[in-house]
Amino acid sequence: MSKYLITVLNANMTQKACPHRNAPPPGVNVYTKDNYSIYEIDGEKNKLYAQNLCLFAKLFLDTKSVFYDVTTFLYYLLVAHNPTPDIPITGLGEDGIGQQEQVVGFFSKEKMSWDNNNLACILVFPPWQKQGLGQILMGASYEMSKREGRLGGPEKRMHFQVLQRLPY
């Protein structure tokens, strides 16, 4: 199967046949509370998934520059259980009901940051923006960095609008 799909028909056929469409993201579930989980994905171990995630993010972030060389990054996906809004087109189960879990955003960070950065990219996908999910992602980034003894800040090249909203 090709990495990129040319037609909508191919995309629909792939979506229906894809064995991963109702599975949780690859990687390790590092946090679960209430209606949310955070999965850690290693860009080296799950290269294609990370590349596709970054290419998808590029649709919404003008400043997104890394989307092929993903092996030096860790990705943290925010997964909502029974999300609002539920977008059933993104994955219908066998019974035609929308999937119960949805990736709603993510952040990434370098595995080895010489500048002690704890955040390289952060994005809440448009249907789920303005629900405070960005704060969950930033809080998770901060807490992980604190536990690692690596208190730094975001990359300096982050978009100005994102920097305005950072609480630390």
Model-found features: residue ranges?
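Glycine-rich acyl-CoA binding loop
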Residues: 130-139
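Non-catalytic substrate-recognition and accessory regions of acyl/acetyltransferase enzymes
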Residues: 1-129, 143-155, 168
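Cysteine-dependent PTP/DSP-like catalytic domain, specifically the C-terminal lobe
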Residues: 157-167
